[in-house]
Amino acid sequence: MKKWDYQNVRGTQDYLPEDESVRVWLRRELEEVFQQYGCKPMETPMINYTDLLASKYGGGAEIKKEMYTLTDRGKRALALRYDLTIPFAKVMAMNPDIRKPFKRYEIGKVFRDGPIKAGRFREFTQCDVDVAGVDSPLAEAELLEMATEVFRRIGLNMTIQYNNRKLLTGMLDICGVSKDQHSAVILILDKREKIGDKQVVNELKEMGVDGKAISKIAQWLKQMSQSGIVDFATDRPTTPIMAEGIAELQELEEALRYLNIDSQCTFNPFLARGLEIYTGTVYELFLTEGAIQSSVGSGGRYDQAISGLTGEEQPMPTVGISFGIDVIYTALKMEGRINQKPLLDYYVIPLQKQKEALAVASSLRKQGFRVDVEFKNKKLTKALDRANKEKIPFVILIGEEEVASGRYKLKNMETGAEQHVPFSF
């Protein structure tokens, strides 16, 4: 029989027990924080109609390039979800009677056929929180406070960068960029920290932006790098949409100060969050130390998505945030922050007394302990070696003598201390 050359699809990976146990812990920590903030659990399908995910209320042109598409037996065009946002918007559109404000969280696999780098894969797990029905920037402030609590609990230091798409839109209007070029220009600006100002200008030229507009953008890039929100409010010309963005940013900034998290938050006038779905506040989360340079979380306000799917003129105010389990796990591993805990509390080793060993294991499991039984009749030295390697704290030995006396032997693997525990065999 031919031996297959097994390997994972590029951009995917297996998580063996020692790794997956940490990821389970991460998910539980995030889920606990989400519930503390009043969020309710939800699950949506991984497979969706391509038209839904590719709609203008989805991720935009850049994400469409990365979608995994397929057809079913009925020749319907389908795609694997690339995030959890549009599936949430679909749920809200299909269930208009959901009481609002509505907070939900979802943890699930998503798929993007994009670049692969440290912590970035093509199949990955996202943890999303979204709030529908609140138009106040206080909703954003609460989500950002929740983010600081998430990273405090898992032991990583991070900072939050934030901006407002209305501010960017207004600046592009002032610079003279045509409306039909706004989305593409914002995508280029979103790459500024990676490619630098010179390359931003080069890409703007390549896409055919007016020369005068490019000159104004270049001047803006040079002048605004160290600007705060107050500079835009007092020292710069504004448009009505820009004034809205400034007011929302000022209200957000005030809330961040009141919540005492402003020291972890930085205004970045060039942060764009390239996805076309966003209509107001946008933010990204970055670790302050370590090798992971890309964001470990992001989000923003997308008031047009739900109403766009329902066809209603009245927007449904919605804001969300997303955390990447895989990139966070990678960061913990790279920084040596993973404190591997044992997966078992007890390891029962029968000395020719398998049925009795099962009875002891069953009793302990009913008390809430994690227990495994050795069934392969390993030599005692090999069984104890397994316990040491897996850092199992207690081993139970059951042989003829233990069954006859009605007491099993309990060994503390850290101290070596032994004791006999009564049990009715």
UniProtKB/Swiss-Prot annotation:
It catalyses: tRNA(His) + L-histidine + ATP = L-histidyl-tRNA(His) + AMP + diphosphate + H(+). Its EC number is 6.1.1.21. One of its GO terms (cellular component) is cytoplasm. GO terms for biological process: histidyl-tRNA aminoacylation. CDD domains: HisRS-like_core, HisRS_anticodon. InterPro entries: aa-tRNA-synth_II, aa-tRNA-synth_II/BPL/LPL, Anticodon-bd, Anticodon-bd_dom_sf, His-tRNA-ligase, HisRS-like_core, HisRS/HisZ, HisRS_anticodon. NCBIfam families: hisS, PRK12420.1. Belongs to the class-II aminoacyl-tRNA synthetase family. Its main location: cytoplasm. Transmembrane segments: none annotated. The lineage of its organism: Bacteria, Bacillati, Bacillota, Bacilli, Bacillales. It is an enzyme of class 6 (ligase). GO terms for molecular function: ATP binding; catalytic activity, acting on a protein; histidine-tRNA ligase activity; transferase activity. The gene is hisS2. It is found in: Cytoplasm. HAMAP family: His_tRNA_synth. Keywords: Aminoacyl-tRNA synthetase, ATP-binding, Cytoplasm, Ligase, Nucleotide-binding, Protein biosynthesis. Homodimer. This is Histidine--tRNA ligase 2. The keyword Magnesium does not apply.
